[in-house]
A protein has these predicted regions:
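N-terminal cap/lid segment of alpha/beta-hydrolase-fold proteins
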Residues: 2-42
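Alpha/beta-hydrolase
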Residues: 48-51, 85-87, 165, 227
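Primarily recognizes the serine-hydrolase "nucleophile elbow" in alpha/beta-hydrolase
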Residues: 120-183
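Short alpha-helix in the alpha/beta-hydrolase fold that links the catalytic acid
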Residues: 179-180, 189, 203-213
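Short beta-strand/loop motif that positions the catalytic acidic residue
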Residues: 187, 193-195, 199
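Catalytic histidine neighborhood in serine/cysteine hydrolases
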Residues: 208, 212-229
Length: 229
């Protein structure tokens, strides 16, 4: 039931908005944006993107297209297409989160579950598009997107690889249904993770290393790059 609208060319890129029925009871559609370079004539290699925590505080998604082109131009020009779903409780959708910080409330649990359902529904959309090579689907996330990868990469095996930056394993208590430590060990795909050893939020010893140790990916398919700073 995907609806495609607002397709237009922006300089050397094509972008469009998609809308889907959400996989849960809701009056608002799940929507998102697709961005790719016009020069690419072969099947596009899809990347499903998860935003930073800025998406929780923002009430508009107007800047997604411009920022994606600016930040990921090097990927677009290499034949990748970036898909940016507007997940539950982000941007201009109904807000049930005030922070990315985990807690053990039912409200937080239900929000994360809905985000996971939006993620899987968005992958359904990617799989339905003939111009995308679903067999080359990858995940990309920074900060909150890195944290959420602990759960998301474990719940859909159509994603074949992941690049995450900053983040780690959340140590705050949450409901067992969404405890990231129970999911991380189920991730088996290749993962590249770039972190900072002096990260003041995602501590190297208590967040970054535990995530790496729990990761179910074989060591030869993990690449953890730790920067000074």
């Amino acid at each position: 039931d995907a609806k495609i609208d607002s397709m237009f060319e922006y300089e050397n890129y094509t972008t469009y908005k998609f809308q889907l029925s959400p996989p849960y009871n809701s009056n608002e559609p799940l929507h998102g944006y697709v961005i790719y370079a016009n020069k690419i004539k072969t099947a596009l290699k899809p990347i499903i993107h998860f935003p930073s925590a800025w998406a929780i505080g923002s009430n508009s998604d107007d800047w997604i297209i411009n920022s994606t082109i600016k930040d990921f131009n090097y990927l677009l020009m290499e034949g990748y297409v970036v898909i940016c779903p507007v997940y539950y409780s982000t941007y201009n959708r109904k807000k049930t989160l005030k922070t990315w910080w985990a807690n053990d409330t039912e409200a937080y649990k239900n929000t994360i579950i809905k985000i996971g359902k939006d993620y899987k529904r968005s992958i359904d959309f990617i799989e339905s598009r003939n111009e995308f090579d679903i067999n080359d689907l990858s995940y990309m996330g920074y900060s909150w997107g890195s944290i959420m990868s602990n759960i998301l990469l474990a719940i859909d095996d159509r994603v074949k690889s992941a690049f995450i930056c900053a983040g780690g394993l959340q140590v705050q208590k949450s409901k067992p249904e969404i405890d990231p430590a129970l999911y991380t060990r189920r991730i088996t795909i290749p993962v590249m993770h770039i972190t900072g050893k002096n990260d003041g939020i995602f501590d190297y010893e208590n967040s970054q290393i535990p995530m790496q140790k729990l990761l179910g990916t074989p060591l030869e398919k993990q690449e953890m790059i730790v920067l000074d700073g």
